[in-house]
């Protein structure tokens, strides 16, 4: 099975240009961050990118507008990573309707409790927008079974400080956890935690069905040339599916 490459970008003024570049250079699904004033789940790089986007005047309305006008330029699926407050403020039904109309494949909502995610799935499943399940490495087995049994799209396994030493190897316990999730899952199980280098990718791809790269992609769009970004994406893609 081909491994999924899921890069993350901040929804900002360069959203369509950046997403198009990613989709033309190996991305299977693109995660688009919706800037929010209190992003509790974001690291410093993504938090700073979100603050810059807010200063640019970026809102969820702007992101929807861009996807509506130019989403056909993005040659792969895309999901929104957003906090529930934004959905609530927009209006749940209106939000799901807009996601459907702008081609959004799914939603990653890091501050959404499992029970609330189930209500949203039941209420708005007819819009065809997946709610992606997040599983932390600290989640107990009983809860994991519950989450996995209701998962759709893909499962996003998240942890912090998962690498051991400087060689980019991930902790054996982390790999065992991913394998145990895969054993009971009916959708791909992807890993997204501090993955930056081809070495990280080579190590974690042995167990995960795909990878999410966030902060490193955001940093490179900020400081690298287009050619350097493409070279990096190609190195990740080659390592992932070698």
Swiss-Prot record:
It is an enzyme of class 4 (lyase). The active site is at 31 (proton acceptor), 42 (proton acceptor). The keyword Lyase applies. Pathway: Amino-acid biosynthesis; L-tryptophan biosynthesis; L-tryptophan from chorismate: step 5/5. CDD domains: Tryptophan_synthase_alpha. InterPro entries: Aldolase_TIM, RibuloseP-bd_barrel, Trp_synthase_alpha_AS, Trp_synthase_suA. It catalyses: (1S,2R)-1-C-(indol-3-yl)glycerol 3-phosphate + L-serine = D-glyceraldehyde 3-phosphate + L-tryptophan + H2O. Tetramer of two alpha and two beta chains. Belongs to the TrpA family. This is Tryptophan synthase alpha chain. The gene is trpA.
